[in-house]
Amino acid sequence: MIRITPHPEWIKEFLDSIEPYKNKIVNNRVFREIESRTLTIEQFQGALINFYPLIESFPKYMALNLAKVPAGNSKWSRYTRYWLSTNINQERLHADWWRRFAVGFGVPSKALEEEIYPPPEIDAINHYLWRICTHSSLAEGISAANYAIEGPTGEWTKKVKSALENYRDVQGIEINEKTLEWVTAHASYDDRHPDEALEIIKAYALTKEEQEQVKQVAKRTMEYYALALDSCYEIF
């Protein structure tokens, strides 16, 4: 298990700099309106369908990062290899959990069986994660996928978990334990994942240039995440 250590000054500055970007995700109108049950079913279903490619591809992004772990048996190679491998196995379950989430909220199962072409505002985050996890450093890939995505996701799922019950009496929606499994899982365990991701980033981003790149990647990932959420109002 990766041990959480005190942050060096550059990580404190990193966290301060990305806080506004994270807040635009966690406090997004989508989640506020889920809490108040004013998000329309059409908007909810549009998001569930068009975010599915991100969910389905997420273990692939992590596998791209796994391929960058330096060969050998050094401490951080072992830790990072094991951490990514374990998380990939877990993430492979999440696409199925998301499908149950969507179907429970009235999305026809066939809509998730065919290829999905998300609007560009939503698909941008997929393209960015493919690029960073394919072509950038291990630290940047971890910053994008495992910190900038998993961190805010752990926070917003906590906010909406109980509020989803507000939709129970809506016609065509069936809420049960399996429907909420994706949200429940992320609300419960993603607290530690971002902290562990930061430890890996600290181990591999050693120069000022690498540290600046990690920061910029996290910011841009969160910008695309917020853009994708905002588009739910303009498109669906």
Predicted feature residues:
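Non-heme di-metal
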Residues: 1-236
